[in-house]
Amino acid sequence: AIMVTMAGGKTALEKEIGMNNILFFLLPKAMCAFLDEDSTIRQAMEKMESAGYSSIPILNKRGEYRGTLTEGDLLWALKYLCFMDMRQAEIHRISEISRRKDNVPVRVTTSMHDLIDRASTQNFVPVVDDKDAFIGIVTRRSIIQYCKQTLFPED
């Protein structure tokens, strides 16, 4: 990734935004879909379908980020748990599913450089506060849309 650092240690994007604050891109917890770690497989499938997400954050009862569940994780779970009946999906919990890869969260104080670096490998970046409470996500799409509007304002 190419990042141009300006005087004062800020990247060109940080200078353009006028801040080093990932809250500019944050989709707050109240506006994004997520799963409780005790959710059933069926609940996970239904929530992901209704939200249109291919991956979704998992939170514990305290609201802390615990990981990411993907469509691929669900597909492999159906194979390994050997069921095609949705009633079985009501019995099994997402905690029984092996997850291929969790999206790594960032703190709300993370630099724009680190946020963009993380977003380059994850379709969304979970954001946590200093007590590890999940406060929302930053989507790769929101960063790309901002860059497009900034670089090509005539579009």
Predicted ranges, named:
Residues 31-32, 41, 65:
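Short glycine/proline-centered loop/turn elements that form peptide/ligand docking sites
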Residues 35-38, 107:
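A short beta-loop-alpha structural element at the N-terminal edge
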Residues 4-31, 70-122, 139-155:
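Tandem CBS (Bateman) regulatory domains
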Residues 48-51, 56-73, 119, 127-142:
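A glycine-centered beta-loop-beta connector
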Residues 40-46, 109-114:
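Short, basic/aromatic recognition patches
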